[in-house]
């Protein structure tokens, strides 16, 4: 496999495959519980729209026909972005959604493809009367944002990649083994241990609890189907992203030396940052630094000015 085809998330896959064969640690699903920090988080306008008859939940901060749209990752939800709302909403309109199958959105028995998720974003933007957006995608949110750009290029101002991938997750054999673990009755153990392995040193106990609660309450059919969606080779083309792209990645030894080159081959207007001392959930581990980096980049590119 060439460097161009190596995954930015090799760390995640390597750990996940190994963990699927490790001894299981039982983990019970638990509902999201409010914490003291909830009182300090600004309250957005909670709304619902529909896609193919299913309700999609989102929160809105501010007004205007352009917005920063925050897209969470696999088995996550809006809560992952709670430390971004206050800082970002001071500058521009912000929308965060629960992708279908996640959070407060409906969880129908459908195929959870990246295309389906992209259509959900378009439905939210249409309901919110947002004409164009900067899409910030964490983890799985990156291929979702890219698929949105493919389908709705005129509605895409720019993309922010948060420890996400622009290349395939792995060869079919690896992906089949990974997905098989999530089909098993012990899937919650595999998900919980996988999340623990990719969490960084600065992630608070409260944040870990919220991440685990979200993941372990995501229905199994969503967990499996969304991972199958990320394994779909059709979403990993070499087609260019011709809008500005900011990539904030967590440094780790599995990325290799050519990650920036790999990204730039697809996204010529790339601003690439590799951060030391963080894990996969960068925006939760170092929220102030993350927020400042995104705002600085938005300012530099004259995006979403009020």
Regions found by a protein language model. Name each.
Residues 54-104:
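Conserved HGGG/HGGXW glycine-rich cap/lid loop of the alpha/beta-hydrolase fold
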Residues 270-306:
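Catalytic active-site module of serine/aspartate enzymes centered on a nucleophile-bearing elbow/loop
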Residues 245-278, 284:
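Conserved loop-alpha-helix segment in the C-terminal half of the alpha/beta-hydrolase fold
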Residues 14-26:
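Bacterial N-terminal signal peptides
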Residues 2-16:
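Bacterial N-terminal signal peptides that target proteins for export
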């Amino acid at each position: 496999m060439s460097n161009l085809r190596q995954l930015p998330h090799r760390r995640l896959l390597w750990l996940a495959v190994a963990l699927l064969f490790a001894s299981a640690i039982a983990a019970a699903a638990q509902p999201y519980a409010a914490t003291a920090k909830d009182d300090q988080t600004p309250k957005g306008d909670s709304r619902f729209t529909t896609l193919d008859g299913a309700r999609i939940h989102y929160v809105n901060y501010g007004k205007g026909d352009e917005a920063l749209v925050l897209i969470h990752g696999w088995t996550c939800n809006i809560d992952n972005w709670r430390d971004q709302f206050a800082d970002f909403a001071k500058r521009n309109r912000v929308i965060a959604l629960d992708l279908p199958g996640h959070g407060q959105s409906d969880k129908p028995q459908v195929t959870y493809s990246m295309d389906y998720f992209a259509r959900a974003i378009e439905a939210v933007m249409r309901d919110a009367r947002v004409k164009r957006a900067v899409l910030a995608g964490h983890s799985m949110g990156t291929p979702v944002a890219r698929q949105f750009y493919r389908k709705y290029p005129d509605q895409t101002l720019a993309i922010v990649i948060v420890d996400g991938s622009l290349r395939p997750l792995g060869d079919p054999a690896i992906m089949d083994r990974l997905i098989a673990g999530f089909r098993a009755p012990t899937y919650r153990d595999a998900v919980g241990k996988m999340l623990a392995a990719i969490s960084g040193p600065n992630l608070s106990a409260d944040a870990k609890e919220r991440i685990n609660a979200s993941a372990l309450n995501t229905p199994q059919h969503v967990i499996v189907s969304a991972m199958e969606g990320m394994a779909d080779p059709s979403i990993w083309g070499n087609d260019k992203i011709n809008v500005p792209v900011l990539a904030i990645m967590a440094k780790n030894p599995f990325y290799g030396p050519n990650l920036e080159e790999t990204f730039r081959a697809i996204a010529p207007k790339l601003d690439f940052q590799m951060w030391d001392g963080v894990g996969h959930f960068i925006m939760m581990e170092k929220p102030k630094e993350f927020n400042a980096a995104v705002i600085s980049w938005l300012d530099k590119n004259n995006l979403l000015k009020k």
